[in-house]
A protein has these predicted regions:
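Pre-Walker A (pre-P-loop) alpha-helix and adjacent loop at the N terminus of AAA/AAA+ ATPase modules
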Residues: 3-48, 111-120
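Conserved RecA-like P-loop NTPase ATPase core
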Residues: 20, 30, 45, 54-57, ...
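Single conserved hydrophobic/aromatic residue that forms the stacking wall/gate
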Residues: 148-157
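Walker A/P-loop
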Residues: 2-6, 35-36, 40-88
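Conserved P-loop NTPase "ATPase switch" module shared by AAA+ and STAND
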Residues: 118-134
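Short glycine-rich substrate-engagement loop in P-loop NTPases that contacts/grips substrate
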Residues: 91, 98-123
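Loop/turn-to-beta-strand initiation segments
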Residues: 41, 121-125, 139, 151
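Helical "lid/switch" subdomain of P-loop NTPase nucleotide-binding domains
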Residues: 26, 103-106, 130, 134, ...
Length: 157
């Protein structure tokens, strides 16, 4: 089978802010906050299935960690960081599907992962898909994680 074959939704998934359709306001707002080094500690994207919440989260992760900078963001994943983020194998970007990992132990793994600074990029980023599916205990542990980092934010190297 040909390794170049991809599902159309993945093949044409937006890779940079200007490729987003129907999300212009949020894309411009987040783009400007990153460009002016005023990004938030966390972003929460809501909406119905298929509107691009995870896609925007990946674009934000790329924008924060692209080796070329936000103005020259890799639309074809040319830099090492953007390529790794697109392939879900970047060491500093952890993507978790909370629909299948709903337990407190899964969130404790996130807490353990967050104890150390980024190793190959500016920021360590967590993308938690379907966060509403976490158990009450897991959500409380996640809240504890966010409180730790809000009170003691880590700045990039």
């Amino acid at each position: 089978m040909n390794k170049n074959l991809k599902v159309l939704a993945l093949k044409y998934r937006p890779k940079i802010f200007k490729d987003l359709i129907g999300q212009e306001i949020i894309a411009k707002t987040i783009y400007n906050s990153i460009k002016h080094d005023r990004s938030a500690n966390a972003y929460l994207f809501t909406g119905i299935r298929g509107v691009g919440k995870t896609t925007i989260a990946r674009i934000v992760a790329k924008s924060l960690n692209c080796l070329k900078g936000i103005d020259n963001l890799c639309s074809e994943d040319l830099c090492e960081n953007c390529n790794a983020i697109s392939n879900s194998n970047h060491i500093d970007v952890l993507e978790m599907d909370a629909a299948s990992k709903t337990g407190v132990d899964d969130v404790r793994d996130l807490i353990e992962f967050s104890r150390y600074g980024p190793t190959s990029s500016k920021y360590k980023i967590f993308i938690i898909d379907e966060v509403h599916m976490l158990s009450k205990q897991a959500f409380n542990a996640l809240l504890k994680l966010s409180l730790i980092h809000i009170s003691e934010p880590t700045r990039p190297r």
